Amino acid sequence: MAQIKNYTLNFGPQHPAAHGVLRLVLELDGEVIQRADPHIGLLHRATEKLAKTRTWIQNIPYMDRLDYVSMMSNEHAYVMAIEKLLQVDVPLRAQYIRVMYDELTRLLNHLLWIGCHGLDVGAMAVFLYAFRDREDIFDMYEAVSGARMHAAYYRPGGVYRDLPDQMAQYDKSKIRSASAVKRLNENRSGTLLDFIEQFANGFDANVDEYCNLLTDNRIWKQRLVNIGIVTPKRALQLGFTGPMLRGSGIEWDLRKKQPYEVYDRLDFDIPVGVNGDSYDRYLVRMEEMRQSNHIIKQCVAWLKANPGPVMSTNHKVSPPKRVDMKTNMEELIHHFKLFTEGIHVPDGEAYSAVEHPKGEFGIYLISDGANKPYRMKIRAPGFVHLSSMDEMSRGHMLADAVTIIGTQDIVFGEIDR
């Protein structure tokens, strides 16, 4: 009797569950995965090389386009690395704003993750609910930067502008009736901080709603429990960070272990898993959303009570006020030089990392004293996690490959860069 040989299957790069342009070459014995070989590079845009041809400030929009669902977290690592080289102090209010928006970005990322992960596995409803909440966070992005996604809001020395005193209002139009506009504007009568506070006060109930849909759902547990198990020792050997590492039971979070900005002033817990499977990683991320919401509430309370500057007073990095620039020749020259030639960063090298929604996102910069980086290296957490795809999926069924891709929370903007 002829022996059935293993066969090869191409998964992606156009597959809806591939989370971008992932090409996965699978070697299958029936429906059991024997080997999984990820092929990357289909979204390579030479970001690290392009960064060498742009000024330090011009590179900030490139950061938004790395992990394009965690925009401000990418910016944060980059501007902190520049601040290390410049030895610039950041005003306390700007630090609180950065932390608040980092945590809003974490919610933005995790909401997309739970929506798409649920959709991949077969849970449709949670996708719709998650995108409802994401809309409010996009409005918060738009309020400070004018852009719903690629904000370019952080700057070396602080943030681009202070939080606005008035949320933008919807107007009646062909696509929105008067009653719809009234409903949309109900919670937009106050400041941006009021809008964020109202969102945060109701968000925990929304997370409970997601958990009610999924946590004890029999089909959800069958698809996630004991799938993609990684032991604590192996997670460290593979270089896991973020929820992938904490899901294996290791309590490592840069916000606690290597505090930056004002995280050491804030109260929050680090959720960890027990079994290291996809279900534990799901539980970790769900609890992370609650902890992020708790941090956001603390930041809102502090920011309401403490007005102040949001940009460094060091004129080598901070532009003049717009009114001064338009009425004073010296300020006009200062503004012109700052945005044409750019800032000159002293010789040296610096590495800065943040607790990104996906793990440790790091930027390594080398400066030769010029107005452009000599070298920029990006440490993307998704790159490390995807490299474990073969090990995590071996011996599982073909349908489980989708679950493992979902639990890794992969975005190709940062992997291919």
Swiss-Prot record:
Give the enzyme's main class according to its UniProt record, as a single word. Answer: translocase
Transmembrane ranges?
A: none
Record's GO cellular component terms: plasma membrane
Record-listed E.C. numbers = 7.1.1.-
The family database entries (Gene3D superfamilies) matched by this protein are listed as: Cytochrome-c3 Hydrogenase, chain B
Instruction: Tell me the function of this protein.
Output: NDH-1 shuttles electrons from NADH, via FMN and iron-sulfur (Fe-S) centers, to quinones in the respiratory chain. The immediate electron acceptor for the enzyme in this species is believed to be ubiquinone. Couples the redox reaction to proton translocation (for every two electrons transferred, four hydrogen ions are translocated across the cytoplasmic membrane), and thus conserves the redox energy in a proton gradient.
| Residue runs in coiled coils | none
Annotated HAMAP family: NDH1_NuoD
The record's GO molecular-function terms, alphabetically, read: NAD binding; NADH:ubiquinone reductase (non-electrogenic) activity; quinone binding
Give the quaternary structure. Answer: NDH-1 is composed of 14 different subunits. Subunits NuoB, C, D, E, F, and G constitute the peripheral sector of the complex.
| One Pfam family matching this protein | Complex1_49kDa
Regarding protein family, the annotation reads: Belongs to the complex I 49 kDa subunit family.
| Keyword Translocase among record annotations | yes
Protein name from the UniProt record: NADH-quinone oxidoreductase subunit D
- Cell compartment(s), UniProt: Cell inner membrane
Catalyzed reaction equations? a quinone + NADH + 5 H(+)(in) = a quinol + NAD(+) + 4 H(+)(out)
InterPro entries in the cross-refs: NADH_Q_OxRdtase_suD, NDH1_su_D/H, NiFe-Hase_large
